[in-house]
């Protein structure tokens, strides 16, 4: 008998495709004068957010553009500055990407009805 089910909510049962963080990362970089592509933004998906930003800042094209725009290679202060734009942007748009995937709500309700515990990551 199944006793528990663990759901990975963000990007799996809601916001399938992780569009909210992708949009927030792209807007945070654009705010600092360095537009990034969706492909560049998606490459480090799954990392902690600051590590994601740091990884993007070390990508060859982004690093060169950052240096051209800001006159220096990206520093930890720059990671903090991009993150400071990213986090509030993400929270301001989450509701636009919060619709559950088809059958996610029904599945959770059925599991509860069956007495199966539900956890999340």
Report each predicted region and the residues it spans.
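Mobile, glycine-rich extracellular loop/lid and propeptide segments
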Residues: 119-121
